[in-house]
Curated annotation (Swiss-Prot):
It comes from Variovorax paradoxus (strain S110). One of its GO terms (biological process) is DNA recombination. Signal peptide: none annotated. This is Holliday junction branch migration complex subunit RuvA. The lineage of its organism: Bacteria, Pseudomonadati, Pseudomonadota, Betaproteobacteria, Burkholderiales. GO terms for cellular component: cytoplasm; Holliday junction helicase complex; Holliday junction resolvase complex. CDD domains: UBA_RuvA_C. Residues 137-141 are annotated as: Flexible linker.
Length: 190
């Protein structure tokens, strides 16, 4: 219903902010990763949102990137993971780190997040395996757009997320897309 808010950042009270849009202040719950990247109070801000309507509340969740919002939406589809738990996960680790933890099946990394027990972490690993990075278009280890393109190309060529991520780690950080794909294919052929 409300997909994006653009306005003036009126208040900052972690994990909630108030965005003033033409005189109307919207309370928005944000993950700490988004909170720390927000401008100062009184400055212009734009947040992608997810609107949750419950019997007792209507809550806006805000995100700095489309990847964060997509990951949030994937997380809340899982039984036992509500919006608060999903927000906690995204506050405890970046989307890339979460994608990497899912890809490499790192149970220990997930249970370190407050509110995530062993059973919930196991459910996350099971239900998100092969989905999180692919659905949101986010490579697990990509730091640049070129690295993201390289990883997506390798996955499109049939390599698993894990194989592609390992090949990407071995590449120089400044490799162009075409150079990176060639080098990664050579490394994967060995």
């Amino acid at each position: 219903m409300i997909g994006k808010l653009t306005g003036i950042l009126a208040e900052r009270n972690p994990p909630q902010v108030v965005v003033d849009c033409n005189g109307v202040g919207y309370e928005v719950d944000v993950p700490m990763s988004t909170f720390y990247n927000l401008p100062g109070t009184g400055e212009r801000v734009s947040l992608l949102t997810h609107f949750v309507v419950r019997e007792d509340a209507q809550i806006l969740y805000g995100f700095g990137t489309a990847e964060e919002r997509a990951a949030f939406r994937q997380l809340i589809k899982i039984s036992g993971v509500g919006p608060r738990t999903a927000l906690g996960l995204l506050s405890g680790m970046s989307v890339g780190e979460l994608s990497q933890a899912i890809t490499t099946q790192e149970l220990g990394r997930l249970v370190k997040i407050p509110g995530i027990g062993k059973k919930t972490a196991e459910r996350l690993l099971l239900e998100l395996k092969g989905k999180l990075g692919a659905d949101i278009g986010l490579p697990a280890h990509a730091a640049t757009d070129a690295q993201a393109d390289i990883l997506q190309a390798l996955v499109a060529l049939g390599y698993s997320d894990k194989e592609a991520a390992l090949a990407l780690k071995a590449l120089p950080k400044d490799a162009t897309v075409s150079e990176g794909i060639k080098l990664a294919l050579k490394a994967l052929a060995k």
